[in-house]
C-alpha cells in the first residue's frame, strides 16, 4: 500500500488542525488550541487505489518556525492553508512556498492552495479570485474549504495526493519519456 506524507502549513489560527481532525475523525473542533506538531494516519481509497495518508499538522506560530525545515524536507506534498477571513494569513502563503522550495531545492513541489473558513462569507477579506490567482502563479490547484461545514475537506487532501502521483510519474520519466530514474555517475580522481 502506498503511503503519502502530507504536510499542512499556514499561519496560526487558519484552521489547519480543524481540517485535519475533520478528515480523520469527522468532527469539528471550534476552540483554538495552538498546535506544536501533531501527526495523523488514515487509510483511504483515492481513485480506486487504497493508500495511507500520513498527515503532519504543523505549528503556524512564528516561534516554532525552526521546526519547519525538518518537516519540509520529509513531506511529499503540502496543503498551504490560509483563512479567507485573514488577509495576513493569505499574504504569508508565498513565504511558506518559498521556504518549501528552498528546503527541497526544487522549482516545483506538489502542493495545493487552500482558502479555509468559506462558511464565514460575511467576514471574508480574501476573494476567491485572489486565491485562484495565487494558485495559478504557483502552478497548483486551489480550493476553498470549511472544516466546520465539511466543504471540500476530503477533496483538498485527495487532490494533493493526485498532485503527488502526477509529480512522481513525471519524475520517473527518463530520456525519451521511458520509465526509470536517471542515474548519475561520479568519478573521483
UniProtKB/Swiss-Prot annotation:
Coarse class of the protein's main subcellular location:
membrane
Q: Does the keyword Lipoprotein apply?
A: yes
Keyword Transferase: yes or no? no
Give residue numbers for the modification (Cysteine methyl ester).
186
Keyword annotations for this protein, in alphabetical order, are: Cell membrane, GTP-binding, Hydrolase, Lipoprotein, Membrane, Methylation, Nucleotide-binding, Prenylation
Recorded catalytic reaction(s): these are: GTP + H2O = GDP + phosphate + H(+)
**Intracellular or extracellular location(s):** Cell membrane
This protein's GO cellular component annotations are: plasma membrane
Q: Where is this motif: Effector region?
A: 32-40
Known EC number(s)? 3.6.5.2
- Top enzyme class, one word, equals hydrolase
Q: What is this protein called?
A: Ras-like protein 1
Amino acid at each position: 500500500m502506498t503511503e503519502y506524507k502530507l504536510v499542512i502549513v499556514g499561519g496560526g489560527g487558519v484552521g489547519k488542525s480543524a481540517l485535519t481532525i475533520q478528515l480523520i475523525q469527522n468532527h469539528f473542533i471550534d476552540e483554538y488550541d495552538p498546535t506544536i506538531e501533531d501527526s495523523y494516519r488514515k487509510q483511504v481509497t483515492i481513485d480506486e487505489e487504497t493508500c495511507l495518508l500520513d498527515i503532519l499538522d504543523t505549528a503556524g506560530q512564528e516561534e516554532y518556525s525552526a521546526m519547519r525545515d525538518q518537516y519540509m524536507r520529509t513531506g511529499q506534498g503540502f496543503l498551504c492553508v490560509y483563512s479567507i477571513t485573514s488577509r495576513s494569513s493569505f499574504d504569508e502563503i508565498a513565504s511558506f512556498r518559498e521556504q518549501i522550495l528552498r528546503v527541497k531545492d526544487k522549482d516545483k513541489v506538489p502542493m495545493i492552495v487552500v482558502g479555509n473558513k468559506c462558511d464565514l462569507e460575511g467576514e471574508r477579506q480574501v476573494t476567491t479570485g485572489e486565491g485562484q490567482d495565487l494558485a495559478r502563479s504557483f502552478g497548483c490547484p486551489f480550493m476553498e474549504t470549511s472544516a466546520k461545514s465539511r466543504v471540500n475537506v476530503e477533496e483538498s487532501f485527495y487532490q494533493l495526493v493526485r498532485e503527488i502521483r502526477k509529480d512522481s510519474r513525471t519524475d520517473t520519466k527518463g530520456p525519451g519519456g521511458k520509465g526509470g530514474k536517471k542515474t548519475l555517475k561520479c568519478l573521483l580522481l
